[in-house]
């Protein structure tokens, strides 16, 4: 009966139209998401987080779930502070150095957690891009590497960049957590490097930065040559692979031309051409450990959009404060067997 459904949903914390909540022992608690979550990604994450036998939460940072994917590879999962999709950071342990890919919001003692897992090894910290859920924890560390186009964006970080997570009364908007567990902002060294730059983690263990503009102007992926893994950043995502526009530039920052859909497509093609160098893909949100044969499907979707941007599968509109102005529109094209590409398109 409808009464029974209401009672069952109330008992589990599920609201109408929402997914079944994921059981969590994290210190953070979800208040709300900014937009509906993808059902397939949610099912994947629910199974992983509730049943994976490698999952561990360390006392030093109760905001992060740690999963072991390889002998030397750990996935660090954390809930997104602003209501967007929850995110991953990845920790590679090399023979002499470790590498942390992305820093999230820096919620909790991220540096202490990394030191705990690695046993205090020297750490190389790198960013895929500058967005808040990937780089706001950078100030937990002394030095961060990134693609050279990302440097001006990271230089814009400041002490008030977390303020938008709270309302005018200081209450958390999307995620319940202790505000004192956010980092105290400090300047850190930003080391911009070119496409193809190689990090040596000891011996013959090398990780290569690959410029993959599209989702962001200075976006980079990383290829672990030893474990044959592509860490793809946000250019690949089982929810929405968001990139730029077909015929306009949505960003106004430096190197903004690298957010265009054509640039995204060309960088996907570059990764397709290098599929013999990696076997698995680890995106920074939702599903990971994905086989590389997904890549041609992404390229096929990109080519279909560029050939006919009007042939989209669905479209969303977002209205601003001015109800008489045109809404912001995003168009979506399905990636065969995976998710969707979101793109901008100015008609006429």
Residue ranges and their predicted role:
Residues 7-10:
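Short hydrophobic alpha-helical segments enriched in small aliphatic residues
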Residues 2, 13-18:
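N-terminal, intrinsically disordered, basic low-complexity segments enriched in Arg/Pro/Ser/Thr
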Residues 17-56, 266-348:
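Accessory terminal helices/loops
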Residues 60-116, 222-239:
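Conserved beta-strand hairpin/beta-sheet module of binuclear metal-dependent hydrolase folds
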Residues 51-63, 67-71, 98-100, 105-106, 143-304, ...:
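Metallo-beta-lactamase
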Residues 17-96, 138:
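Zn-dependent metallo-beta-lactamase
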Residues 34-36, 105-200, 238, 293-294, ...:
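Active-site HxH/HxHxD metal-binding segment of metal-dependent hydrolases
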């Amino acid at each position: 009966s409808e009464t029974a459904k209401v009672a069952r949903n109330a008992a589990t914390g599920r609201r109408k139209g929402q997914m079944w909540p994921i059981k969590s022992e994290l210190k953070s608690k979800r208040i709300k998401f900014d937009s509906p979550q993808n059902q397939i990604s949610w099912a994947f994450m629910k199974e992983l987080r509730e049943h994976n036998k490698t999952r561990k939460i360390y006392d030093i940072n109760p905001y992060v779930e740690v999963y072991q994917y390889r002998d030397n590879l750990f996935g660090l999962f954390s809930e997104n502070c602003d209501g967007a999709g929850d995110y991953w950071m990845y920790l590679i342990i090399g023979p002499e150095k470790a590498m942390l890919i992305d820093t999230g919001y820096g919620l909790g003692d991220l540096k202490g957690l990394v030191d705990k897992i690695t046993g205090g090894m020297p750490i190389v910290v790198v960013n895929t891009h500058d967005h808040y859920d990937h780089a706001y924890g950078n100030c937990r560390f002394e030095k961060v590497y990134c693609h050279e186009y990302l440097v001006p964006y990271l230089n814009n970080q400041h002490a008030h960049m977390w303020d938008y997570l709270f309302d005018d009364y200081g209450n958390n908007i999307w995620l319940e957590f202790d505000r004192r567990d956010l980092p105290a902002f400090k300047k850190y060294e930003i080391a911009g490097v070119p496409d193809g730059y190689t990090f040596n983690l000891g011996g013959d263990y090398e990780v290569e930065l690959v410029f993959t503009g599209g989702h962001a102007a200075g976006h980079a992926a990383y290829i672990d040559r030893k474990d044959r893994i592509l860490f793809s950043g946000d250019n690949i995502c089982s929810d929405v692979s968001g990139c730029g526009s077909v015929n306009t530039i949505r960003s106004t920052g430096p190197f903004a031309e690298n957010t265009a859909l054509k640039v995204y497509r060309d960088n996907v093609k570059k990764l397709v051409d290098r599929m013999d160098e990696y076997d698995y893909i680890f995106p920074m949100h939702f599903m990971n450990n994905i086989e590389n044969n997904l890549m041609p499907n992404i390229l096929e979707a990109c080519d279909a959009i560029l050939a006919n941007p009007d042939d989209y599968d669905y479209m969303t509109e977002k209205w601003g404060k001015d109800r008489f102005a045109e809404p912001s529109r995003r168009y979506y094209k399905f990636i065969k067997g995976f998710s969707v590409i979101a793109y901008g398109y100015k008609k006429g």
